[in-house]
Amino acid sequence: ATGVRYREKAGYVRIGTDSSVVTLTAGAEMATQFGGTIHHYLGAAQPMHLPGGLREAFYAFVAKGGSDPTDGDGYANASGNTVGAWRFALTARSRREKMAARLYYDHFFEDESAAFDEYGWLDGLIGLELSLPLQSLHTVVAEFVRTDYQSGPVYHDHTPQLEEQVSGIDNYYNHGLYPGWQHFGMAMGNALFASPLYDHNGTLLFT
């Protein structure tokens, strides 16, 4: 893909200050790739030009609306490639010992069902950061990430015969039109995602 546009936004609320004994932070971050030209889509000789004007910029901002040329009749995907995360952190401090502990959780999503708990928040990153009053060891961080649930193992678009919508198989960081959430084969935004560069299979797909 060439000429792709990018929009990023974030918003947070914090209860407490840097000097409070307990601080709670909660918010969300979202980023969208949209517009540009897609080359060799399914082996096509002609490039596919995707709209990237003000309307699509608005769709990218609200993460809703729009479509792309590959949508079937009656099926409209949101414009562009959107990723995001709900982020929460709880920090506790000991003023006397100059110690602090921060427990944090990131729930990442790529569609509306994952963003709004339609199938449960089973994928995400949970971490613990300890700040110690030692010169030789100042900070200890432990993190665990899970990505194998992906809203379940089934994806089914609603049809007149079967109206139920099942929005599983989120396939994190991959996209049907854009070459994944990577830069020169390296994952962006999450160090615990295995980058496509290391697969040595000639693709930019996250597996």
Language-model regions: role of each:
Residues 7-9, 14-22, 55-72, 89-93, ...:
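Elongated scaffolding segments in large macromolecular assemblies
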Residues 1-44:
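Internal, well-ordered domain-core segments that constitute the primary functional module
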Residues 69-207:
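Outer-membrane beta-barrel pore domains
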Residues 2-7, 37-80:
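Primarily recognizes Gram-negative and organellar outer-membrane beta-barrels
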